[in-house]
Amino acid sequence: VDAVEDSDEARTRAQKAEAALYRVYGDNNLEQLDLETEIDCAILGDACYKVIWDTTEKKVRVTAPDVQGIYAWWLGDDTSQMWRVASKYSLSAEETELLYQAKPKGKTATIVELWTARDFELYLDNALVEKKPNPYGFIPFIIYSNLREPKKFWGISDLPQIMESQRELNRAMSQLSRILELSGNPIAVLENVEESENIAIRPGAVWNIPEDARAYLLDLLQGGGISLHINYIDLLYRTLHDISESPRSAFGGIERDISGVALEIELNPLLQKVRRKRIIRSVVYKRRNEMILKLLEKYRGEDFGDNHLRIVWGPVLPQDVARQVNNEQTLVQTGIHSRRTAMDEIGIRDPECEFKRWLEERETILRMNKELNAKSTKSGARERASLSQAEGVEE
């Protein structure tokens, strides 16, 4: 959280807003919620957050409703402007009576919440139960896509593009498994034998066959045929990794030592995919933080001022911390970066608090140095006085 105005009061309010966000994140376990929501988003193609005020516990509540029950209306061709959102979900009769003081006719009830920026409507089994002005002044839902299709509101899942390759890989693996199973239970072949009975294939078995007959076991692996199946499976693996933009090296499949730049080039498809997703998520998390601060200002009377919210992402690849620190040190010394910006880039969670600690340590060290210098000055003066007195006595 960065203050828009350049004043001590504005910076204090920005620090207060950042601390409030950290508390809400901790109260709602948002790190775990974000992980679960991201998995749902990758599978379903879309995800949703709901930010409301919990009147019972008097705090901000952040949840992730099932996006399959979310319906949205947007303005014309501008898919970023939602003017109405409906949330549909089912509750048991006991839950319905506990939450809404209404007893449904059946064992379950269908609840529909209809939100606009001005109004809120609640339906229970298609019957209007409550209608009132929106207490928040905004729609408390944030709907976002996994990967957005051009000019469409709803996104696409990561699964359809890899499903065909995965099915073919499963078929090839099953075929190879059957071949290996048959080779482990070989088939006995008897030539020039008109009839046979009680022929068992086991260690030490003795077969009595005519003089001109021949017996042998059918080897399904001879001639290198099994290698064709293995090569085809490797080809499917490569296709699967290429389509999903996740190179094999992302799973620790590097069998040679390479430099950091070479690793970054090899993982570039995955980095581009992560970057596309982060662009979408940055807007979502920023909007969620804005909703949290608005609810705290409305219901707790807080005043956070006018601030600029930023999302700081961690590095995807392992970083050379020593090199990064040296680069930031040079940027700070040349006046290009401030100390707080350098801390942000390195990954310090709370740069403002860390900067305060640095100032306190610096002030303590300077005070100790002054005290030591003062003591050494007094000691030197005493030694000089003692020497002067000794010289006077000798004379």
Predicted region positions:
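Short, Φ-rich (hydrophobic/aromatic) sequence segments
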Residues: 1-2, 33-42, 159-176, 281
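Conserved aromatic-histidine-acidic binding/catalytic patches
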Residues: 1-5, 9, 37, 157, ...
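Structured, mid-chain assembly/scaffold modules that mediate subunit interfaces
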Residues: 1-139, 292, 296-303
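Short coil/turn segments at secondary-structure boundaries
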Residues: 2-4, 34-40, 51-54, 180-192, ...
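A broad, structural surface signal
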Residues: 19-30, 43, 54, 167, ...
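Short low-polarity hydrophobic stretches
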Residues: 49, 166-169, 342
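Extended, charged amphipathic alpha-helical segments
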Residues: 122-265
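C-terminal helix-loop subdomains that flank or include functional centers
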Residues: 194-195, 201-216, 220, 227-228, ...
